[in-house]
Amino acid sequence: MSYPKKVELPLTNCNQINLTKHKLLVLYEDMLLGRNFEDMCAQMYYKGKMFGFVHLYNGQEAVSTGVIKLLDSKDYVCSTYRDHVHALSKGVPSQNVMAELFGKETGCSRGRGGSMHIFSAPHNFLGGFAFIAEGIPVATGAAFQSIYRQQVLKEPGELRVTACFFGDGTTNNGQFFECLNMAVLWKLPIIFVVENNQWAIGMAHHRSSSIPEIHKKAEAFGLPGIEVDGMDVLAVRQVAEKAVERARQGQGPTLIEALTYRFRGHSLADPDELRSRQEKEAWVARDPIKKLKKHILDNQIASSDELNDIQSSVKIDLEQSVEFAMSSPEPNISELKRYLFADN
């Protein structure tokens, strides 16, 4: 049974957010890539090209794009089992992510990780993690080494920022509280991004937490806790920009609670029978991609033809990614134990 509860999203005046045409189109293209990549994953999964659990990100694109597109190449991102789109936003090539989902040697994890373990050292993408909260200590460690390099090893340059993504269900786990405490104690350059999509598999968020407003939990540890409309990429970017600047300047962590919603079931094996039709329709009406498209067209920032060209480019990219994945070799069975240890 679904327990729908109307979620009031924080209001943001997008017209007060001044971004260049180029930056806006980068955001639009990144969200389109994420959405269409996940749709292609669903097609390939049901055709038997992918195996195991596959968790899709449809509906939550504004969070990934709004945060990650503010980061530099040297910054870090740590994800969850719903990790494909985070990797794409960080710059991991779509063909290598697709090949990983196919279990091929050309995948970003050499075909050993699959859907829940996307990883790319060249892009400082620290990976997806199959169990909730696993990534938070890893992300905290990445932020700690950034401080250590600057303060102890006296390496020049700016602090590297870490963005750590996790869901609402994770915030009842011990690692969440422990790492918030450490991050504040050591003023770590980390942004904790809670993608509150209202459901932890089949558990409605408001039924699982004594304080449903996750951002309020930051107060106990002495760091800023900010709630944002996770269906609005410009609102997310505005909040994340301040968090990145704060981290980069050595002022410590920020907790961002992005109110969002997944348009598909928990995984492709989930029939999605627990959520009501009314609840899903209300959130789908807030589609972040359609919202940004309307903003661009209403303000005459770009034409429909330009946006259609972006859509076509994304479609071609994904078709090529599937062709690449299908034509790539399987891992050699003789190398089954390779990559288990650092010397490999």
Curated annotation (Swiss-Prot):
EC number from the UniProt entry: 1.2.4.1
InterPro entries per record: DH_E1, PDH_E1_Alpha_Subunit, Pyrv_DH_E1_asu_subgrp-y, THDP-binding
GO cellular component: chloroplast
First-level EC class: oxidoreductase
Example GO biological process: pyruvate decarboxylation to acetyl-CoA
CDD domains, per the entry: TPP_E1_PDC_ADC_BCADC (cd02000)
Origin: domain of life: Eukaryota
Cofactors, names only: thiamine diphosphate; Mg(2+)
Residues where Mg(2+) binds: D168, N197
Binding site for pyruvate: H55, Y81, R82, A130, I132, D168, G169, N197
SUPFAM superfamilies linked: Thiamin diphosphate-binding fold (THDP-binding)
A GO term for molecular function: metal ion binding
Pfam family, one: E1_dh
Alphabetical UniProt keywords: Chloroplast, Magnesium, Metal-binding, Oxidoreductase, Plastid, Pyruvate, Thiamine pyrophosphate
Subcellular location: Plastid, Chloroplast
Gene3D superfamilies registered for this protein in UniProt: 3.40.50.970
Reaction(s) catalysed by this chain's protein: N(6)-[(R)-lipoyl]-L-lysyl-[protein] + pyruvate + H(+) = N(6)-[(R)-S(8)-acetyldihydrolipoyl]-L-lysyl-[protein] + CO2
Keyword Acyltransferase belongs to the record: no
Residue sites binding thiamine diphosphate per the record: Y81, R82, A130, I132, D168, G169, N197, H266
PANTHER family cross-referenced by the UniProt entry: PYRUVATE DEHYDROGENASE E1 COMPONENT SUBUNIT ALPHA, PYRUVATE DEHYDROGENASE E1 COMPONENT, ALPHA SUBUNIT BACTERIAL AND ORGANELLAR
NCBIfam families: PDH_E1_alph_y
Function: The pyruvate dehydrogenase complex catalyzes the overall conversion of pyruvate to acetyl-CoA and CO(2). It contains multiple copies of three enzymatic components: pyruvate dehydrogenase (E1), dihydrolipoamide acetyltransferase (E2) and lipoamide dehydrogenase (E3).
Subunit record text: Heterodimer of an alpha and a beta chain.
Name of the protein this chain belongs to: Pyruvate dehydrogenase E1 component subunit alpha
Gene behind this protein: pdhA
